[in-house]
Amino acid sequence: MSGSKAKSRELARDVALQAIRTLYLAAVDAVRRGDYELARRLVAEADETRRVMRLRKPRFLRRGVCRNCSLPLVPGVTARYRLVRDGSVTRLVVTCLACGYIHRHVLVQRRRGSR
């Protein structure tokens, strides 16, 4: 790949990521106003932009959107966040208040016995 072609691809990738972030933030604002359908459409548009550009899903889309109902997860509005300690593992448990789907993310996994 030539240098200018790689640069233009990188520039297009950066512009697409900015557009995806802007759409996600607009979806979060729509949820705070109570317009859930607009928020879903904005998230779908952000995901479509990501697919067209063949990008990995950014972390804020992986963790900030419900997999079941495609609604942005806003603490206290559409999501409940809890920390659960289970033996040697600490998990972040996010419950979508719109559909009830439960997301579990491992935060800390402590090792036993090794010093």
UniProtKB/Swiss-Prot annotation:
Entry keyword annotation includes Nuclease: yes
This protein's UniProt keywords: Cytoplasm, Endonuclease, Hydrolase, Metal-binding, Nuclease, tRNA processing, Zinc
GO MF annotation terms: ribonuclease P activity; zinc ion binding
Predominant subcellular localization, coarse grouping: cytoplasm
Any single biological process term in GO: tRNA 5'-leader removal
Alphabetical list of Pfam families matching this protein: Rpr2
Cofactor binding description: Binds 1 zinc ion per subunit.
Subcellular location: Cytoplasm
Residues binding Zn(2+): 66, 69, 96, 99
Catalyzed reactions per annotation: Endonucleolytic cleavage of RNA, removing 5'-extranucleotides from tRNA precursor
Family matches, as InterPro entries: RNP4, Rpr2/Snm1/Rpp21
Cellular-component GO terms for this entry: cytoplasm; ribonuclease P complex
Enzyme class: hydrolase
Cofactor(s) the protein requires to work: Zn(2+)
Domain of life, source organism: Archaea
EC number, UniProt record: 3.1.26.5
Subunit structure: Consists of a catalytic RNA component and at least 4-5 protein subunits.
Similarity section: Belongs to the eukaryotic/archaeal RNase P protein component 4 family.
HAMAP family: RNase_P_4
Task of the protein: Part of ribonuclease P, a protein complex that generates mature tRNA molecules by cleaving their 5'-ends.
Protein name: Ribonuclease P protein component 4
